[in-house]
């Protein structure tokens, strides 16, 4: 069974490398392309994107925050568009060219809980499109004579193996909710300077900092 992170890395690498092979992404324009992920999602996706020169944007947990970034990129692009231009009227190749020319071209988005997106036409996790992306990536791997597991091994041989583990702390009821609020407030008002004997170099507030 593949984890959500493994599928995301498989799709991200295949999608980015395919766009590079097709000449859509080049060394000149890759800096205007981006991969968006939630900050609890594996950093292997970031390593893959950085290898190809793409920007990496981390968001709060939840796919709606990825959708918010896509809306932001649309608004930024249309702020420089001719009067009367409509984003929804643009064809996919026109959107891509515009974003790569003066905006931020969204290549892939994902989170570890099996949610993926390869286009900004949908602003939430898209199971239908994800299934098509996975089928295409599997076909691409098969054309190379390898399995999905083999493809992942190729990724690990380049970027190293990223060990992952999911865990959760459950605080139930009104008392639990109040405790969560107190903890969050304490972290924001007085960020920790050390964890055990390890010094904290910096703290990032994903709810306020520019991502």
Where are these regions (language model features)?
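Catalytic core segments in nucleotide and nucleic-acid processing enzymes
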Residues: 15
């Amino acid at each position: 069974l593949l984890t959500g992170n493994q599928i995301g890395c498989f799709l991200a690498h295949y999608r980015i490398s395919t766009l590079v092979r097709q000449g859509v992404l080049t060394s000149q324009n890759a800096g205007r392309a981006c991969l968006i992920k939630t900050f609890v999602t594996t950093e292997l996706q970031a390593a893959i994107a950085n290898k190809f020169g793409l920007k990496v944007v981390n968001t709060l947990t939840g796919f709606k925050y990825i959708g918010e970034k896509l809306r932001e990129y649309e608004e930024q692009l249309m702020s420089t568009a001719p009067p009367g231009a409509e984003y929804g009227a643009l064809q996919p190749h026109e959107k891509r060219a515009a974003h790569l020319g003066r905006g931020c071209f969204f290549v892939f988005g994902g989170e570890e809980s099996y949610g993926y997106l390869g286009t900004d036409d949908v602003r939430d996790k898209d199971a239908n499109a994800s299934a098509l992306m996975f089928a295409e990536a599997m076909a691409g791997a098969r054309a190379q004579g390898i399995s999905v597991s083999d493809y992942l091994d190729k990724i690990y041989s380049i970027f190293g193996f990223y060990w992952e583990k999911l865990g959760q702390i459950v605080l139930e009821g009104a008392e639990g909710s109040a405790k969560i609020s107190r903890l969050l407030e304490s972290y924001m008002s007085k960020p920790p300077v050390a964890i055990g004997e390890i010094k904290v170099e910096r703290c990032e507030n994903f709810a306020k900092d520019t991502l």
